[in-house]
Amino acid sequence: MAPKKKGGGKKKKKDDGAEPPHDGSWERAVESGTWEKPVTDLPDANTWPTWGALRERVLTACREIKINNTASLRDAFANELVKLSPPELTLIDLRGSSNLHNFNLSPMTTCPKLTDLDLSECAGLDYVLLQSQTVRSVNLRKNPAITKALIHCPRLNKLSITDCPALETLMLWTDELTELDLTGCNNLSVVKLQCPNLLDSKIPPLKVAPQHVKPSHPPIASLLKENLTTAAHKAAADKEALAGVKDTSDSIIPHVFRPF
């Protein structure tokens, strides 16, 4: 009988180059059409090369994206989402995303089925540009840092934009909005509305931009120019006067050698 090999045979080495296991929520999101977990739980191409395509598959399959009260969501994700333009997406809810600073939904054909957008309570949100043929409801309430909102959504019929104390500029184009409440937006200086069906509006008094007052004294440049002109005229006059002076002396000693 042959002796047994010591060690029970060779153990297989662990393959360090194997793809990490997939999160079960990825496939569930594809099947349900809803993503509700943080951005950091999505597949990431930096973790595994093929996960970039997997990430795109998850996002483009979504009908609803709800990522609330997180600091991990930044402008890069918002731009990625708009660029992918998921064909069945109807709801984007990014409420409470404290590190979201700019949101640009453009051009008009982006996210062709999107109807609802919630960007409320985003502490760092500063600028919003929305262009959409399909969006009907937008929530921008309680954004303390937002300064400018440009909204061109012909079918918009609900806009919540109260309690935005830093908002300076609002430009709004919509055919269906009937009510507009800007209570708590007390820093407004520019409000341009193209809303033919607007019936009721609450708009605080606009702040008048400071006008530049012309100084009562002449500008320094004009004074310098005037001084230079006067000096030039004086120099020319002196030159003419010197040229007109004639030496009337009868001395035969040349003028240059005359003693002082």
Curated annotation (Swiss-Prot):
**What are the record's GO terms for cellular component?**
axoneme; motile cilium
The annotated regions of Basic and acidic residues compositional bias extend over 14-30
Q: Which SUPFAM superfamilies does the entry link to?
A: RNI-like
Tell me the domain of life.
Eukaryota
- Quote the biased-composition stretches of kind Basic residues, using this chain's numbering: 1-13
Q: Which UniProt keywords apply?
A: Cell projection, Cilium, Cytoplasm, Cytoskeleton, Flagellum
Q: Where in the cell is it found?
A: Cytoplasm, Cytoskeleton, Flagellum axoneme
Cell inner membrane among the record's keywords? no
Region called Disordered, residue ranges: 1-43
Family listed: Belongs to the DRC6 family.
Its function, per the record, reads: Component of the nexin-dynein regulatory complex (N-DRC), a key regulator of ciliary/flagellar motility which maintains the alignment and integrity of the distal axoneme and regulates microtubule sliding in motile axonemes.
Subunit composition and interactions: Component of the nexin-dynein regulatory complex (N-DRC).
| The name this protein goes by in its record | Dynein regulatory complex subunit 6
Write down the species. Chlamydomonas reinhardtii (Chlamydomonas smithii)
